[in-house]
């Protein structure tokens, strides 16, 4: 009896250990094998001064000219007409440099960017702000190639304006709009310069994993929660039409072969403010472009002088428009990488807390649908197991009951048989 008991106990222990190992391995394989990590390769700031000055070019500065606004209509080519606002310097000798504005996710109207566009026009730069189409633009779906085509039509209109030098016409883009901008630069060779402000730089889910980590950390979430929230970004959201999570930023980033100005606000926790600038510099250098300037301003994601995201009525960060104008006028006057009197990287000291991971592959649970299915299946399986257990118990009880009745009937039959 003791031997049987020991064997049974040993068998149960071995089975339990094997099942624990199997389920632990399965759980490990289900989870993504990466974590967001603190960012440690900090960028070197040469000066706290955000001023940008060409060493040899004589350029106009902000406020030099009065400005004039003209309302335009831009045809997208598929029957839609978009409003646009053109701002020009009055009395500036032509042909002039010009800049097309590309919206990020928080703006879409022709009236947006008004303070920046008007300031640039007062420094002799013609600016055009077209509206962005919002049809078929949702939290889940964004058609970046379509936007690039439409902004390309606006660029053609700007380049064709009297008083504009098409060879000195470039683009200004913010946030999500910088992805659109790089698609545009990959399709066209006639873009004279690119200003990229608050750029995600990395692929969608890489940047979003970093941003989620920063947000949850700021909210005071425990470290395991911070890690697991970031890992949700590794799931496949395509069934929910969240295709922009897989936007291939690397594919287009290499097209930045023209002079580039990179701007970030040091209060911006949603963007890779150090890693992104370093990535743009490195990628541009590989393409033979060393004329990349980086500036950090004491501002938020919208380059406003405050920490609130989308807080209305905040003024622009100090020195922001002056830096834009001096840089655009400098590069369009022919200033090369070695022609600046000011450092390549300067401004307020940034601090990027988390790195944008470049490895965001999922585990066995590769999609939100599978995860949702498992979450639903768990309780369902428990209920089914309970029902099965009850059924087996009832079945066993019935078997015992029937066996007992047969036994009683047999005994009675034996006693009833004559000897």
What do these predicted ranges mean?
Residues 94-104:
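Short beta-strand element of the alpha/beta-hydrolase
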Residues 106-117, 132, 274:
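The serine-hydrolase catalytic nucleophile loop
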Residues 141-162:
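Alpha/beta-hydrolase active-site loop
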Residues 157-216:
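Primarily recognizes the serine-hydrolase "nucleophile elbow" in alpha/beta-hydrolase
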Residues 45-94:
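N-terminal cap/lid segment of alpha/beta-hydrolase-fold proteins
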Residues 117-137:
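Conserved alpha/beta-hydrolase
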Residues 256, 262-264, 268:
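Short beta-strand/loop motif that positions the catalytic acidic residue
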Residues 7, 289-290, 298-302, 306-419:
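Alpha/beta-hydrolase-fold serine-hydrolase catalytic core, especially in secreted/extracellular enzymes
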């Amino acid at each position: 009896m003791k031997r049987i008991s020991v064997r049974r106990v040993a068998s149960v222990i071995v089975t339990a250990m094997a099942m624990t190992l199997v389920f632990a391995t399965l759980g490990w394989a289900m989870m993504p094998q990466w974590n967001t990590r603190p960012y440690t390769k900090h960028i070197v700031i040469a000066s706290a001064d955000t001023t940008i000055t060409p060493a040899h070019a004589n350029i106009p500065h902000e406020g030099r000219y009065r400005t004039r606004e003209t309302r335009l209509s831009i045809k997208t080519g598929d029957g839609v007409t978009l409003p646009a606002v053109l701002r020009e310097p009055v009395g500036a000798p032509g042909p002039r440099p010009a800049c097309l504005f590309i919206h990020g996710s928080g703006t879409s109207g022709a009236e947006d960017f008004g303070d920046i566009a008007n300031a640039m026009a007062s420094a002799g730069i013609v600016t055009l702000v077209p509206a962005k189409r919002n049809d078929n633009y949702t939290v889940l779906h964004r058609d970046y190639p379509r936007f690039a085509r439409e902004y390309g039509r606006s660029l053609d209109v700007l380049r064709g304006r009297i008083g504009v030098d098409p060879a000195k016409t470039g683009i200004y883009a913010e946030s999500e709009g910088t992805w659109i901008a790089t698609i545009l630069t990959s399709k066209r060779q006639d873009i004279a310069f690119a200003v990229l402000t608050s750029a995600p730089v990395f692929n969608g889910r890489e940047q979003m994993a970093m941003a989620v980590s920063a947000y949850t950390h700021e909210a005071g979430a425990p470290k395991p929660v911070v890690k697991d929230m970031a890992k949700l970004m590794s799931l496949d959201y395509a069934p929910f039409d969240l295709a922009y999570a897989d936007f291939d930023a690397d594919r287009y980033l290499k097209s930045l072969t023209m002079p580039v100005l990179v701007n970030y606000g040091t209060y911006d926790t949603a963007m890779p403010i150090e890693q992104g600038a370093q990535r743009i510099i490195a990628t541009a250098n590989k393409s033979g472009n060393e004329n990349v300037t980086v500036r950090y301003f004491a501002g938020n994601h919208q380059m406003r002088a405050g920490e609130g995201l989308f807080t209305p009525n905040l003024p622009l960060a100090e020195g922001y428009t002056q830096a834009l104008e001096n840089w655009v006028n400098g590069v369009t006057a022919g200033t090369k990488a070695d022609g600046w009197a000011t450092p390549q990287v300067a401004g307020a000291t940034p601090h990027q807390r988390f790195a944008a991971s470049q490895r965001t592959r999922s585990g066995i649970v590769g999609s939100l649908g599978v995860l949702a299915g498992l979450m639903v299946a768990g309780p369902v399986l428990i209920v089914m197991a309970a029902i099965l257990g009850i059924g087996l118990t009832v079945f066993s009880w019935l078997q015992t009951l029937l066996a007992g009745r047969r036994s009683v009937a047999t005994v009675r039959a034996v006693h009833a048989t004559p000897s």
